[in-house]
Amino acid sequence: MSSLLPVAVYGLEVPPGDILVPAQFEFPATIRITMAAIDPTAEPETDGQGNVPTVPRSTLKLIKTTAEEDDDEYLDIDGEDSEDDEESDDEEVNGGPSDPAKSKKARREAAIKKLLEATKEESDEEMEDADAKPNGKGKKDSKGKAKASESDDEKSDEDDEEGEPNFEEFVVCTLDTERTYQQPIDITITEGEKVFFVVKGTHKVYLTGNYVLPEGQDEEDDEDEEDYSDEEYDLPHGIELESDSDYESDELDEIDGTPRIKEIDTDEEEEEAPKLVDTSKKGNKKRPAEEAENLDDLVAKDKKQAEKQKKLKNNKGEAVPAENKDVKKEGKSDKKVQFAKDLEQGPSGPAKDKLEKKEEKKDDKADLKKPSLGVKVVQGVTIDDRKLGTGRTVKSGDRVSLRYIGKLTNGKVFDANKKGAPFTVRVGKGEVIKGWEIGLIGMQVGGERRLTIPPHLAYGSRAMPGIPANSTLVFDIKLLEIK
């Protein structure tokens, strides 16, 4: 069952008596039943004579229909051509006595009725044996009538056997009020499968489990999520997908304690200006025309000064006077101030954007490692720590136990675990929605946290029981244990 993921809670109540209760599907998914239980404190129901057994108990049975191989053939008996069938359907919209759909429904109802009568035969036979008289004549009459009725029943059974669905009955478990109140089971019912439950005994049987979906369905949702843009969900600035080249350039640009603009006394300074211009091109963002001209003028001016210095040195064969060096240094300082201004205050400087992104990533990592009270956004999930816990923090791969309440943004509760067995999950293994995988990291035992999860990190465009499509979900979580 590792290929199926639980998505919602399933529950079914089966009362005692000859009542067939179908396994109802509230929405298209597979049902997995994992527990059958009774309430030992409830009053036991009496039998037909008003008696209660010494040890009240209930037996749960599963009844399923076998595959009806001739259903399609039966529907196609009246015509071999699909066109003829369409014409006949148009002529008789409401159907008639020989309508295949009606006859099929009637046969199923008759079969269910027959099954209910069969379940009563056991108790009826015991009552008949107790009320039977010892008179020999009476016995002969009853036998004669019984034979006649049996022959009639056999004839009617032979007539009804053709076309009726077959039922298979299986005993699941027997529960009593002294030792066995509940029984773990593992029954999977696929969508469209005809399955019924019936209980014989004194108490109601409660069946619980989950609606489950195949893992492959999540991959389709992931493909849909790729179509969503950042603007559609209004992601915070800096929380976005980046290429590997961006990460490499960030690591090269950021070294603690190193100034962003470094003074170089050699001729390598002449090569710095083209590099800065190239970085702006790398970011695929254009500077205003005026700023571009300023940069070009500065570069051209610097090159002219360098050429003059070389000419003086070549013609005279002497070192350049100190005054000219001072002028050159002043030119350097002016140029550096101008470049720093463009980098820090330019409307589209890539260095500034990368620095901001890197700082936000550092803040996210710090928030995960050291939880603190307050609201923060981590990878699109809004985390509000209401109470700090103690001990080590949750990391990927940990199995945790917790309580939670799930709500929509309008305050409507769609799921909760407030008592009984706590909810357990292994973090980072795809057992829950992505918003939980992100929001549980960094919690401590005893801590309380509110997660606000956008749709693309929850169920996306898929509607769930009590959860409309594209819903933002709010979870209040209390961590009980880290295993």
UniProtKB/Swiss-Prot annotation:
Q: Which UniProt keywords apply?
A: Chaperone, Isomerase, Nucleus, Rotamase
Q: Does the keyword Chaperone apply?
A: yes
The UniProt record lists the EC number as 5.2.1.8
Looking at the record, the residues that make up the PPIase FKBP-type domain are 397-483
Question: Where is this chain compositionally biased, Acidic residues type?
Answer: 68-93, 151-167, 216-233, 241-256
Say where the protein is mainly found. Answer: nucleus
- Please give the superkingdom of this protein's source: Eukaryota
Q: Which reaction does it catalyse?
A: [protein]-peptidylproline (omega=180) = [protein]-peptidylproline (omega=0)
Record region (Disordered): 41-171, 208-371
> GO CC terms on record?
chromatin; nucleolus
Q: List compositional bias (Basic and acidic residues) regions by residue number.
A: 108-121, 130-150, 298-309, 323-344, 351-370
An annotated Gene Ontology molecular function:
peptidyl-prolyl cis-trans isomerase activity
Which Pfam families does the record associate with it? FKBP_C, NPL
The UniProt entry, under SUPFAM superfamilies, shows: FKBP-like (SSF54534)
Q: Does the keyword Electron transport apply?
A: no
Give the quaternary structure.
Binds to histones H3 and H4.
Give the similarity note: Belongs to the FKBP-type PPIase family. FKBP3/4 subfamily.
- In UniProt terms, what function does this protein have? PPIase that acts as a histone chaperone. Histone proline isomerase that increases the rate of cis-trans isomerization at prolines on the histone H3 N-terminal tail. Proline isomerization influences H3 methylation thereby regulating gene expression.
The name this protein carries in UniProt is: FK506-binding protein 4
Q: Report the source organism.
A: Chaetomium thermophilum (strain DSM 1495 / CBS 144.50 / IMI 039719)
Q: Which gene encodes it?
A: FPR4
